[in-house]
């Protein structure tokens, strides 16, 4: 396990009620950071996560808000930054597959205009909204942004063609934001493969087994695996920006 001294650092993690987001918030808080955990308003898992981390002695707070809605995202980011006294790190982890089952690329009828708009608003425009609102705080702190993309953003194969397109766009925006916000702010991304979490979209077990058979490390990645990569890009990697780090156990090797 990699480690760092994050005492005095301030972080906002979106999509932090479960999975990679919660793993990241837990790791950062355990290393001394003050962490604002964001997820959808009314999601009971958000309050449960905050309560559990506080019981462990961590300095955390809930920052409910919908990154898929412009005003909600803006208010959430600014309120969180003011509440914790600034922002050193923004982790854009919130995202949605928008479907409970994978949609084959040929099933164009299932990929409606409304489906496109929802995924674009959450997965692609959502991170932009958060970066836009957080930029003044991050520049003042000479901070860092990490976006959660996906290996499907490189070669497809995700929950839908639409999802893959949004993650490909986020990989591209990671480069654009690195140029736009440097030298004060570094912007990177991770591209996860298989994740051990209760994700909204469930892939067939045969597909998961086939993926594991191809992957050199032969296991599904845990939220902690991805959190360590995010920690590296936030607290280390001082000469790395505009990069998307593939974290998939070798699945795409």
Indicate where each model-derived feature is located:
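Catalytic Tyr-X3-Lys loop
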Residues: 96, 109-128, 146, 163, ...
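Substrate-binding pocket helix/loop in short-chain dehydrogenase/reductase
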Residues: 101-117, 200, 211
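C-terminal substrate-recognition "lid" of short-chain dehydrogenase/reductases
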Residues: 84, 131, 137-139, 219-247, ...
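Short, small/polar-rich loop/turn modules that mediate ligand/substrate recognition or access, typified
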Residues: 182-186, 240-242
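Active-site helix of classical SDR
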Residues: 131, 166, 174
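Alpha-helical segment proximal to the catalytic Tyr-Lys
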Residues: 136, 178-183
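Canonical Rossmann dinucleotide-binding motif of NAD(H)/NADP(H)-dependent dehydrogenases/reductases
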Residues: 4-36
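Residue(s) in the substrate-gating loop at a strand-loop-helix junction
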Residues: 150
